[in-house]
């Protein structure tokens, strides 16, 4: 098999499949016109194109050969192709089954060295096993050597073809091939040798044949020799193959006999073979292979009833058997077919010779005109092959179209010539046989098959319809002539402009027409119409006259275009790839070099040129058949889309909206991205410049991520199709180049993320926009590729950072697969243990166990992409969950249960109730009134899973852009790249990217010259013919557009094609033409149209002359007007130029500044890069050190392990020896002990026997045989006569009894009594001790004292709330340890006086255990302690959690105490996990139910007998460290308590735990409480009043007008906005305060109400505070009249009051203020004008704003009632709570700063000073510009005494530099003296008077320190001070008053004096700093 063959399933035989549909007239073309043509069908050729309209492609079973569209070909001595062009077919006799030579067209240069016996034929037919192989022959430079034969006379028939309509894929009627592949040359073609014969005839050719000679087992091919022809015939490119306009070669079938046989055949045999070859054709079975995805496949003529012809199955003859047997052998085996073909050629040449002479003479008149439309070949010959005719094309159509082209070239009246030529060529076709009509001028909206079929179907039965919208025409075929005539008569009613003509298939008079069944019903058109060739022309004909070398693309070029059929790739026996490459390099380099400089103006021309370049390069490529030498493709494309594809898709209008220039349909080369092309069997191997390397792929993906991913404003369908298609293209390039590295992995990962995102984002889109199944398939392919790449990289030692993420995605995508866990176990340990894979495994467990609660919780906690994958299972899990709920909540099938719909929405994570209702209804359940009726019998399972909707919970997770999601992180920078262009600014091809792609040639092609009869006229004689291209090159890729011939002809091409050997015979007489009435009517119509056109041209010429005369008269008037207007325009232009010059200078300055900034930036970047380099070096060093350390550690561990193993071995051996010894010793001791025990046992038995005998003997001796009959008191004496009687008391006390002779007996009666009494006493003591101990152990804790003692800090009121978290002990027995501990812990925190009955909470929620409210002392301070204890049993239900959040049970909690249940010893890990998970669930429920801030401390009580690892086990089981890191708890401690309550150890532990909780409780909140009115007033007074009144006083004392009202109002509103933001801060919402149990409605200073920080309440407070704002007011114009200004002021004041009742109050105040202003102004103006009044600057705007503010504060009412009723206190006030520190963050608005700065500037100008100490008021002081008042007072006094003093500016205006310097020094000295004097006076006053803070007001500094601001009564005298009064008298009076009121000691005076001095210094420093800051601001 051939590894490079795209059809690897084919054997290397010539034509191994019978399904290849190749013939003259295949009845069903397998593709629509404009699509890629499968080889073997007629490729449609546009009449406007000079190249191919399709590139034929064929399936794997096809055995056809490909023909390349190269125009220049030089055959080496091994070439065995004979160049022939037939009338209807171009067939080549190929004698080899190896890879057939790609037929090329160009200068006719051949070099045949080896002699061979070849017959020359006018028709070049290819021999093959079947009619499935074509090798189009191209003409090169011919040098033939023929041995003359006397009877071999051939006359080429070239006059019947019309070049614009001829296609380049011409199929011979007979095909033969020979099975045995030859190895005579790399091309595999047999050599030829022709004797060269020269003839002066231009129309006939004599050929001589010699017996063929076999060379290297190759059969000879037949190649004709043609004599040189004159220059005139050569230049008629569109008409002639060999230079004649009418001569054409027809193709004939050739017998499969051996070539060496004599050529004997009859005419009948030739004709029969021709007809058989034509008729035996069938369409290809695989029609649509290789078609583009977006191309329309419905317009194929195959859908319109084309009748298939029979298959052609010619015999195959050769020296060796065929490589593969043909599939069908149904053709009758005829004999001497080769001879019949020769005879038919003889006769055909004789018949058409005369017609060729006539046409040759006729075309001599317009040779010069035709040359302008031909290819411009510098010094070369233009007699090259014209495009071949497609089989089945009508000769009449060819002639008519050809004549139209000739007329256009002549520039003469062409229509008459066209008609004459058309009618002359009708031949034997009768008008009654025409069954088709042609409709012209059809509008686009009517030019549709459906509309036309409906229209003509009403008239007659339509067979088929072909449309061409670009030409506004359509061809309609009927079944008979009568139907066509009726349709032609009545069909014009469709549209008024439509014209209908007969559509006839014209047949050449020199050929017998084939029957309709034998003809292919389509011509070579690009459009769907197959029979409208005569009406189409080349689009490149216009550009041909403009371009020189670029005229290669001209349709009317005389170059014979090669066939569209591709040269099929065969595998020869053996050939050297190096020699092949060297031989094929010469013509490739020359061909590519000739393309340089070719002009291609349009995108279509550029595409054709680039396509021709690619085809040449494909032919020059070395085809490797050895797998060992196979190499991986390496892409070299630098653009996101290859250049050829950009032009191709622009030509075909296949551009996306993201790739075009906005507003046009032109391609945006910078935005075009390579389109995905589906792989097919007929595709060529890609060239390097068609593949993008990895950096370009990465840049392409970056472009898609940054520029496309987030552009979803338009159609989602276009967006998804574009991104999906382009990412598939990236993946295909990766696959073709076999890329595998981390960057490649990242590209595939981004593709995967895109598909995961679309799986959820596009799930609601219709099937036409998004197919989830296809998306999942692509996602699966991406994940599979990633899996393989991860494995390959891991084998190389490379680990990918995102492997765990995508392995997790793979698991999530396969949750329904049963063996997914087995695949997970095969992951790398690091991947398997990652959080992503663990999450996927958890999802698998939840889905397969139908744990829908767990599943949806995982969805809520998952990342966005994980959630998108889990979204695919929503329908499945919801269906299973609904089934489980329906079964669980219903008793039987007869009874239904009502279930709340909200619960379903919450549990199954629906978007809303509507979506849940739809889902439930789909499953047969009824929903009504917010509830669903669960019923087992009504439950239905719909077929399949319903289409899920987008989930809002997943959408919320998309917190970043889609690009960042797909990129997996922040977006990369936007890629910048300039696309590569192979054309310069003059649209000339420069070929920049070709050098790197051509193979290096080591062999120069041989040169051979041929003399010709036209060398003098056509140019320089050629020196070296172009060698043949390698014939084993891969077939070109299918292309649905015409492929332009791009190889330019070189000057070295021979001027002639063939040299005719004998003078031709005279041509036969022309046939008599036949005309019909319809033809005459058509001619008349055309004559009328031509006459009308000439008349219109005359009228237009007269009108143009008149217009020219009128323009001449108007020019004089125009000159006068221009002269008058020029002066004004010049002035305006001069002014504009001046302004532009200024702007230019400003821009230069800005550029200089930008350059400076750029340099600084570069410096910073260099420093940063150095820093990064150092950091990177350190990081690398750290990594190497870490690796070294890890290696050393590993070695040390291994060494230590070996040592340990050795030591363990020794220990084990010693231990075993010890065990053996112990066992032996034990056995010995055991035996000895057994013996001793045996001895002792028998000895003891002996002793017992002896004792028993003694006792029996004593009893028998002492005890009577019967009881004695004596009194009880005498029985002792009777029994023991010798005993003591009575018993002595002393002996009895001693416990002795004297029995006389029997001895003394000791008794213990009293001792037993004493022992019993003692024991009973001790038992009583122990009982009471245990009872007391139990009472103490069960006693309640003194919580108030504990809290007061251990609470950090000092507080007067303490609120402490503890939550006990107890296990669920309801199901345990009363005697169980866990229940006892829970009850005991509740008793410890209950207390007698503090216990309460919590009836508000049910048993499943949180209960209030106790409340304490008492006074406790801490040191000498009494503290009010309020303690609340809450208790929670077990895990809370959802309803209980909702109740907790609603009732705010956990609000204000200060600590948590968790009691774990006693742990049962068990080895089952599942039970242990359940134990810890239940405790963790209970704890997390409470932590999540409480407010987020603050985090609480946690105490964990563990009942255990004791252990070392208890604390570690608790930390791991409850994940306490994670809770701390998540800020759910602040700290924790684990306390072990005994599991039984029998001592005080448990109480001590609990006491310590409470102390720890109190000491670690959250700090109390620093909240301030004020009423709303008080808060607003204090805030305004603190931030607004000081600034406002100071500014007002400063301006008044400085004699300035009032401040602008806009700045004052903006300052006031800014303060209110600040106050509103403080009181409604978002951080208040998360505070867990107050304690719910102690809070009161309306709130208090200690505790706010429960809803104080609710978002609704805070929003209401913000709105209420903002309700104090004033509306904006702009200052009226300075010259505004008084009355309108007053009206405006009154109207503004009317907006302030909140009610109509208070509006008159403010209105009267405003009117009073205006009246006083008017009176003051009137007093200054003795005789005011009527209606006049104060100016705008004289109106006291500050007083007006002050009145409005005061009224607003007094008259304010809330906009509406508070949201909650608890916000109102008992007295109707609303308390607000805020942080005190937040009030210190106010920033003064910029407008007020500017207003203050303007005030300072105005004061400076007014006082005539250059600089004064500026004022910068702080936030909480009221500085007053008294220094200014003092200076103004002094200046006013001096001016009153001395008159006006000139200002400083007046004095310095005319001074010199020395005078200015002296003036500056003098002024500086005066300032210093004045400052010194002021300080001395102030100090003297401080020392002399005891005024302290009540010193001289005029001497106060401008900048008051903080220490003096508190003396607010210093403002009062200033408020009353008038400018006209004496400051000294006021000062003395105030000082006396203060002196009388102050009676302080001397020490206090000194301290106060020191404080004043310090404050003065601070004020000076602050003043200087502020002044410098203001000066800097001014400079900026």
UniProtKB/Swiss-Prot annotation:
Residues 1236-1256 are annotated as: Interaction with Centrin. Residues 33-340 are annotated as: FG-repeats. SUPFAM superfamilies: RNA-binding domain, RBD. Residues 1162-1200, 1207-1235 are annotated as: Interaction with ENY2. Residues 1133-1170 form a coiled coil. Residues 686-1003 are annotated as: Interaction with PCID2 and SEM1. Residues 775-958 form the PCI domain. Residues 1-24, 212-230, 414-425 have a biased composition (Polar residues). Pfam families: CID_GANP, MCM3AP_GANP, NupH_GANP, SAC3_GANP. It catalyses: L-lysyl-[histone] + acetyl-CoA = N(6)-acetyl-L-lysyl-[histone] + CoA + H(+). It comes from the Eukaryota. The modification N6-acetyllysine is found at residues 489-490. Residues 293-326, 347-365 have a biased composition (Basic and acidic residues). Residues 1162-1256 are annotated as: CID. Changing residue 1272 to M: In PNRIID; uncertain significance. One of its GO terms (cellular component) is nuclear pore nuclear basket. Residues 1658-1790 are annotated as: Acetyltransferase. The modification Phosphoserine is found at residues 430, 508, 538, 557. The modification Asymmetric dimethylarginine is found at residue 32. It is an enzyme of class 2 (transferase). One of its GO terms (molecular function) is nucleic acid binding. It is linked to Peripheral neuropathy, autosomal recessive, with or without impaired intellectual development: An autosomal recessive disorder characterized by early childhood-onset of peripheral sensorimotor neuropathy, progressive distal muscle weakness, atrophy in hands and feet, and gait difficulties, often with loss of ambulation. Most affected individuals also have impaired intellectual development, although some have normal cognition. Additional features may include eye movement abnormalities, claw hands, foot deformities, and scoliosis. Belongs to the SAC3 family. Isoform GANP: Component of the nuclear pore complex (NPC)-associated TREX-2 complex (transcription and export complex 2), composed of at least GANP, 2 copies of ENY2, PCID2, SEM1/DSS1, and either centrin CETN2 or centrin CETN3. The TREX-2 complex also associates with ALYREF/ALY. Interacts with RNA polymerase II subunit POLR2A and with the transcription elongation factor SUPT5H/SPT5. Interacts (via FG-repeats) with NXF1; this interaction is not mediated by RNA. This is Germinal-center associated nuclear protein. The lineage of its organism: Eukaryota, Metazoa, Chordata, Craniata, Vertebrata.
């Amino acid at each position: 098999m051939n590894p490079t063959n795209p059809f690897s399933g084919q054997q290397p035989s010539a034509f191994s499949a019978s399904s290849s549909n190749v013939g003259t007239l295949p009845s069903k073309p397998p593709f629509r016109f404009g699509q890629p043509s499968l080889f073997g069908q007629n490729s449609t050729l546009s009449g406007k194109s000079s190249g191919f309209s399709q590139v034929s492609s064929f399936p794997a079973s096809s055995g056809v050969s490909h023909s390349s569209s190269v125009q220049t070909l030089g055959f080496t001595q091994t070439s065995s192709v004979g160049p022939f062009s037939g009338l209807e077919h171009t067939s080549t006799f190929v004698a080899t089954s190896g890879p057939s030579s790609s037929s090329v067209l160009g200068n006719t240069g051949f070099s045949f060295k080896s002699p061979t016996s070849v017959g020359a034929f006018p028709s070049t037919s290819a021999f093959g096993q079947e009619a499935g192989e074509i090798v189009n022959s191209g003409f090169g430079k011919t040098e033939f050597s023929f041995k003359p034969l006397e009877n071999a006379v051939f006359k080429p028939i070239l006059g019947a073809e019309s070049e614009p309509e001829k296609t380049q894929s011409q199929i011979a009627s007979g095909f033969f091939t020979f099975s045995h592949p030859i190895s005579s040359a790399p091309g595999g073609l047999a050599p030829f040798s022709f004797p060269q014969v020269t003839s002066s005839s231009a129309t006939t050719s004599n050929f001589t044949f010699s017996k063929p000679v076999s060379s290297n087992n190759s059969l000879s091919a037949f190649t004709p020799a043609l004599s040189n022809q004159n220059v005139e015939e050569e230049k008629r490119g569109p008409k002639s193959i060999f230079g004649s306009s009418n001569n054409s070669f027809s193709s004939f079938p050739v017998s499969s006999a051996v070539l060496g046989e004599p050529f004997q055949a009859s005419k009948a045999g030739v004709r029969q073979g021709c007809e058989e070859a034509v008729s035996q054709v069938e369409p290809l079975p695989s029609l649509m292979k290789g078609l583009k995805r977006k191309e329309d496949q419905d317009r194929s003529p195959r859908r319109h009833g084309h009748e298939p012809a029979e298959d052609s199955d010619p015999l195959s003859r050769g020296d060796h058997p065929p490589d593969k047997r043909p599939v069908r052998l149904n053709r009758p085996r005829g004999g001497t077919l080769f001879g019949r073909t020769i005879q038919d050629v003889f006769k055909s040449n004789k018949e058409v010779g005369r017609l060729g002479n006539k046409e040759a003479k006729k075309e001599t008149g317009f040779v010069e005109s035709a040359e302008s439309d031909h290819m411009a070949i510098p010094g070369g010959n233009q007699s090259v092959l014209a495009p071949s005719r497609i089989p089945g094309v009508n000769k009449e159509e060819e002639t008519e179209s050809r004549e139209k082209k000739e007329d256009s070239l002549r520039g003469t009246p062409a229509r008459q010539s066209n008609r004459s030529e058309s009618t002359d060529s009708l031949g034997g076709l009768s008008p009654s046989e025409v069954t088709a009509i042609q409709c012209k001028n059809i509008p686009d909206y009517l030019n549709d098959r459906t509309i036309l079929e409906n229209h003509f179907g009403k008239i007659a039965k339509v067979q088929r319809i072909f449309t061409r919208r670009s030409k506004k025409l359509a061809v309609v075929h009927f079944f008979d002539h009568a139907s066509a005539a009726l349709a032609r008569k009545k069909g014009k009613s469709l549209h008024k402009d439509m014209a209908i003509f007969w559509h006839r298939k014209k047949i050449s008079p020199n050929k017998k027409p084939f029957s309709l069944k034998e003809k292919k019903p389509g011509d070579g058109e690009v459009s769907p119409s197959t029979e409208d060739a005569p009406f189409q022309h080349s689009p490149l004909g216009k550009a041909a006259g403009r371009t020189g070398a670029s005229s290669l693309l001209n349709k009317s070029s005389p170059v014979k275009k090669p066939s569209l059929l591709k040269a099929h790739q065969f595998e020869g026996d053996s050939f050297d790839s190096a020699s092949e490459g060297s031989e094929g390099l010469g013509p490739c380099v020359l061909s590519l070099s000739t393309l340089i400089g070719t002009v291609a103006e349009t995108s279509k021309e550029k595409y054709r040129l680039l396509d021709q370049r690619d085809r040449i390069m494909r032919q020059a490529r070395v085809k490797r058949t050895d797998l060992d030498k196979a190499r991986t493709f390496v892409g070299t494309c630098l653009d996101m889309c290859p250049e050829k594809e950009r032009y191709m898709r622009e030509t075909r209008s296949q551009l996306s909206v993201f790739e075009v220039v906005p507003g046009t349909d032109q391609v945006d080369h910078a935005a075009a991205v390579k389109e995905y092309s589906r792989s097919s069997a007929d595709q060529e191997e890609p060239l390097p410049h068609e593949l993008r390397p990895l950096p370009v792929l990465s840049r392409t993906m970056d472009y898609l991520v940054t520029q496309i991913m987030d552009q979803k404003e338009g159609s989602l369908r276009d967006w998804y199709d574009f991104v999906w298609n382009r990412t598939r293209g990236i993946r295909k390039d990766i696959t073709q180049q076999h890329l595998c590295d981390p960057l490649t992995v990242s590209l595939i990962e981004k593709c995967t993320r895109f598909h995961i995102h679309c799986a959820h984002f596009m799930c609601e889109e219709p099937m036409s926009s998004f197919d989830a199944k296809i998306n999942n398939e692509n996602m699966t392919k991406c994940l599979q590729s990633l899996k393989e790449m991860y494995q390959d990289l891991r084998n190389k030692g490379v680990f990918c950072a995102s492997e765990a993420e995508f392995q997790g995605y793979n698991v999530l995508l396969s949750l329904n697969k049963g063996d997914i866990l087995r695949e997970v176990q095969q992951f790398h340990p690091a991947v398997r243990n990652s959080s992503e894979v663990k999450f996927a495994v958890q999802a698998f467990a939840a889905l397969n166990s139908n744990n829908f609660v767990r599943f949806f919780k995982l969805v809520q906690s998952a990342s966005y992409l994980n959630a998108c994958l889990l979204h695919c299972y929503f329908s499945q899990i919801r269906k299973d969950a609904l089934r489980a709920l329906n079964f669980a909540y219903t008793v039987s099938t007869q009874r239904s249960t009502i279930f709340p719909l909200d619960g379903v929405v919450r549990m199954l994570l629906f978007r809303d109730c509507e979506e849940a209702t739809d889902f439930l209804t789909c499953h047969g359940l009824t929903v009504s009134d917010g509830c669903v009726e669960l019923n087992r019998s009504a439950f239905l399972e719909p077929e399949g899973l319903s289409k899920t909707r987008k989930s809002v919970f997943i959408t919320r997770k998309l917190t970043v852009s889609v690009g960042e999601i797909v990129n997996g992180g922040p977006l990369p920078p936007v890629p910048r790249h300039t696309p590569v262009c192979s054309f310069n600014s003059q649209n000339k091809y420069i070929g920049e990217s070709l050098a790197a792609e051509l193979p290096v040639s080591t062999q120069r092609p041989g040169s051979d010259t041929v003399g010709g009869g036209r060398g003098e006229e056509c140019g320089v004689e050629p020196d070296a013919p172009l060698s043949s291209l390698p014939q084993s090159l891969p077939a070109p890729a299918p292309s649905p557009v015409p492929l332009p011939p791009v190889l330019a002809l070189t000057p070295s091409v021979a001027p002639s094609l063939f040299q005719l050997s004998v003078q031709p015979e005279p041509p036969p007489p022309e046939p008599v033409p036949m005309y019909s009435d319809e033809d005459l009517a058509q001619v008349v119509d055309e004559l009328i149209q031509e006459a009308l056109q000439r008349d219109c041209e005359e009228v237009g010429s007269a009108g143009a002359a008149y217009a020219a005369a009128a323009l001449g008269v108007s020019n004089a008037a125009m000159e006068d007007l221009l002269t008058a207007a020029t002066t004004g325009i010049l002035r305006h232009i001069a002014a504009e130029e001046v302004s532009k010059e200024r702007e230019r200078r400003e821009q230069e300055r800005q550029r200089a500044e930008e350059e400076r900034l750029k340099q600084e930036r570069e410096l910073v970047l260099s420093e940063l890069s150095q820093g990064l380099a150092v950091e990177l070096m350190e990081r690398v060093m750290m990594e190497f050190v870490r690796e070294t350390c890890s290696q050393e550690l590993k070695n040390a561990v291994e060494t230590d392990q070996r040592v340990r193993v050795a030591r363990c071995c020794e220990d084990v051996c010693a231990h075993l020896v010890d065990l053996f010894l112990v066992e032996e010793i034990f056995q010995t001791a055991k035996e000895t002990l057994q013996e001793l025990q045996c001895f002792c046992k028998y000895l003891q038995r002996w002793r017992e026997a002896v004792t028993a005998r003694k006792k029996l003997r004593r009893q028998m001796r002492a005890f009577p045989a019967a009881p004695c009959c004596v009194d009880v008191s005498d029985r002792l004496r009777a029994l023991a006569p010798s005993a003591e009687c009575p018993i002595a008391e002393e002996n009895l006390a001693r416990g002795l009894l004297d029995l006389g002779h029997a001895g003394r007996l000791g008794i213990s009666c009293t001792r037993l009594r004493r022992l019993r009494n003692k024991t009973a006493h001790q038992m009583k003591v122990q009982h009471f001790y245990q009872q007391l101990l139990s009472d103490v152990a069960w006693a309640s804790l003194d919580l108030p004292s504990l809290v007061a003692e251990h609470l950090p800090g000092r507080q007067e009121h303490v609120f402490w709330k503890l939550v006990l978290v107890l296990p669920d002990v309801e199901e345990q027995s009363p005697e169980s340890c866990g229940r006892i501990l829970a009850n005991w812990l509740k008793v410890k925190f209950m207390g007698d006086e503090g216990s309460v009955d919590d009836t508000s909470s049910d048993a499943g929620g949180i209960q209030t255990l106790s409340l304490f409210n008492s006074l406790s002392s801490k040191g000498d301070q009494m503290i009010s302690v309020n303690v609340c204890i809450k208790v929670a049993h077990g895990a809370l239900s959802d309803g209980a959690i909702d109740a907790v959040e609603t009732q705010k049970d956990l609000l204000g909690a200060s600590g948590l105490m968790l009691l774990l249940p006693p742990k049962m010893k068990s080895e089952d890990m599942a039970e242990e996990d359940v134990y810890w998970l239940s405790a963790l669930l209970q704890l997390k429920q409470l932590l999540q139910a409480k407010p987020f801030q603050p985090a609480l401390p946690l105490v964990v009580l563990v009942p255990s007998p004791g252990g070392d690892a208890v604390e570690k086990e608790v930390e791991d089981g409850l994940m306490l460290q994670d809770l701390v890191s998540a800020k759910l708890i602040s700290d924790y401690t684990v306390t072990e308590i005994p599991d039984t309550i029998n001592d005080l150890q448990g109480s001590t532990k609990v006491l310590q735990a409470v102390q720890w909780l109190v000491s670690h409780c959250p700090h109390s909140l620093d909240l301030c409480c004020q009423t709303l009115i008080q808060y607003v007033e204090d805030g305004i007074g603190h931030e607004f009043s000081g600034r406002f009144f100071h500014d007002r006083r400063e301006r008044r004392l400085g004699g300035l007008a009032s401040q602008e009202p806009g700045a004052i109002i903006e300052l006031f509103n800014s303060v209110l906005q600040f106050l509103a933001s403080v009181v409604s801060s978002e951080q208040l919402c998360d505070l867990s305060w107050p304690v719910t149990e102690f809070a009161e409605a309306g709130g208090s200073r200690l505790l706010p109400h429960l809803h104080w920080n609710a978002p609704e309440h805070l929003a209401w407070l913000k709105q209420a505070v903002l309700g104090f704002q004033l509306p904006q007011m702009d200052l009226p114009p300075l010259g505004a009249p008084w009355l309108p200004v007053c009206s405006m002021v009154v109207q503004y004041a009317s907006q302030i009051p909140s009610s109509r009742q208070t509006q008159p109050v403010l209105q009267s105040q405003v009117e009073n203020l205006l009246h006083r202003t008017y009176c003051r102004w009137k007093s200054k103006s003795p005789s005011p004008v009527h209606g006049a009044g104060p100016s705008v600057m004289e109106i006291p705007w500050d007083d007006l704003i002050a009145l409005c503010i005061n009224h607003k504060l007094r008259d304010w009412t809330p906009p509406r009632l508070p949201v909650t009723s608890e916000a109102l206190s008992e007295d109707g006030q609303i308390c607000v709570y805020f942080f005190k520190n937040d009030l210190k963050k106010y920033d003064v608005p910029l407008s007020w700063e500017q207003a203050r700065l303007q005030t300072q500037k105005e004061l400076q100008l007014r006082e005539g000073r250059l600089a004064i100490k500026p004022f910068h008021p702080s936030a909480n002081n009221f500085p007053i510009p008294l220094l200014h008042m003092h200076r103004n007072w002094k200046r006013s006094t001096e001016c009153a005494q001395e008159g006006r003093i000139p200002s400083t500016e007046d004095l310095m205006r005319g001074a010199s530099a020395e005078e200015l310097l002296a003036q500056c020094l003098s002024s500086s000295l005066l300032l210093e003296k004045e400052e010194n004097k002021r300080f001395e006076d102030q100090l003297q006053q401080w020392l002399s008077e005891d005024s302290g803070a009540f010193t001289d007001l005029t001497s106060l500094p401008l900048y008051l320190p903080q220490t003096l601001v508190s003396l607010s009564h210093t403002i009062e005298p200033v408020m009353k001070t008038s400018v006209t009064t004496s400051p000294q008298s006021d000062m003395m009076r105030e000082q006396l008053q203060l002196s009388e009121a102050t009676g302080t000691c001397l020490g206090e005076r000194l301290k106060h004096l020191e404080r004043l001095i310090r404050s003065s210094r601070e004020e000076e420093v602050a003043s200087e700093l502020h002044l410098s800051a203001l000066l800097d601001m001014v400079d900026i």
